[in-house]
Amino acid sequence: MNELLNEVTLIARAAGEAIMEVYRGHIEVERKEDDSPLTVADLAANHVIQSNLKRLTPDVPIISEESASIDYSIRSGWRRYWLVDPLDGTREFIKRNDEFTVNIALIEDGRPVLGVVYAPALGLMYSASAETGAIKQQGTTAPQIIRARPLHAGQPVVAGSRSHSNEKMDAFLQQVAEKLGPPKLLSLGSSLKICLVAEGEADVYPRLGPTSEWDTAAAQAVLECAGGCIVDVQGQPLRYNTKDSLLNPEFFACGVAPPAWQHYLT
């Protein structure tokens, strides 16, 4: 698995290079059927990732945000597959705030067992497997093992979306303020929010709105290998490819030994 993880980090870097070529120039935006944005960078990164994964593991199927949908009657029989978001945070990419990522995860029996999250504009790589643990590398500095943290006395730190906020999130923050004290809010784009929890910079990332499975899988692998977890609002672990829809339930990305964050919902 360690060798496989190394190969996937190289693929993520290559996809990041394709994205940055577009990022440095004029960005043209199309709209998908659900009105979400699509750029040439999404498609270029998708091509790099899919072609390289097929070379690396020709017998392992791939689900990608930018590929044709695969009926559940087919994928329900998959024990092992790749789950990819070639460019997570397209809105951040369009805004040019650098907070977008390449997400690649290997799913086995409904769980992400290997994950790579690469933010090419930031030179920031997160990678994880059971054998290696969770690793962060900034630029060319030495990789370091990261660990999520338990909630401790003092100001709670909550990671939140830079592009997606709603009344549920506002109500959650109010409950946290009343029970634990006013939280510090860290706003960030893409799956980097989950990685903040994985490296112990935040206590929780509540996602109280829609996401797709490719948005979370790679970062969930990083978080779980760092000692944290992602649970839905019933406290159950987030699982993959269990139904026709590829939408996630609302969830909490949590640190070590977390409180029942769902009790902070009104």
Regions found by a protein language model. Give the residues of each.
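Acidic beta-strand-loop-alpha-helix segment within the catalytic core
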Residues: 104-195, 242-266
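Residue-level signal for inorganic ion chemistry
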Residues: 19, 42, 53, 90, ...
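Generic detector of well-ordered alpha-helical packing
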Residues: 43, 66, 86-89, 120, ...
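Conserved beta-strand termini and adjacent loop/short-helix elements that scaffold enzyme active sites
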Residues: 32, 65, 188, 207, ...
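Glycine-rich active-site/cofactor-binding loop and its immediate structural neighborhood
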Residues: 78-120
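Oxyanion/phosphate-interacting regions
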Residues: 1-10, 171-178, 194-266
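N-terminal subdomain of lithium-sensitive/metallo-dependent phosphomonoesterases centered on the IMPase/IPPase/PAP
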Residues: 1-87, 171-174, 236
